[in-house]
Amino acid sequence: MGRVMGKVFIQTYGCQMNEYDTDKMFELLGTQNYTPASSMDEADLVLLNTCSVRDKAEQKVYSELGRMRRLKKQNPNVKIGVGGCVAQQEGVKILKRAENVDFVFGTDNLFELPEILKETEKGTRPVQINRLAPRQKVRDFIPDFSTSASNLPALKAHLAITKGCNNYCSFCVVPLTRGTEVSRS
């Protein structure tokens, strides 16, 4: 095993798809030698995996980022990233409103986390909210429950069959944040 990069804390908001994405992030960051932190205060990397469907989602994210100013003040080396649906919608606006945020990544970009983190080491504040074109099939991801990177209880797992939606209902942001529907086959 390589050197330990540090500890990661992920705060997840919203739906089961976000829980699934969070588990993918833990697994992916585990391959980069990050271990889970039990709180933001002990983390070297803090990620907010956001939801824009639930009530007042954007306000919750910006409120949490405001509270996290203290964290950045206490530990200027902590990296703070915002991902998920609010990140997909807001993009660079997050960096403008919250100077303590180091990077933003969208729903299709979580597999790019290692590269995004390398960019932050160069002193940049990357925003990666690009839709992957052409839309890729849902990547297989089966959590490895033998590692401490998994944050789900041993008797619970998520399996994505589809991602996104083709119905642009007037009240729903899913097609805008998760993209058009793609499936495993």
Question: Which residues fall in each region the model found?
Answer:
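Proteins enriched for Cys/Gly/acidic motifs involved in redox and nucleic-acid/cofactor modification
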Residues: 1-185
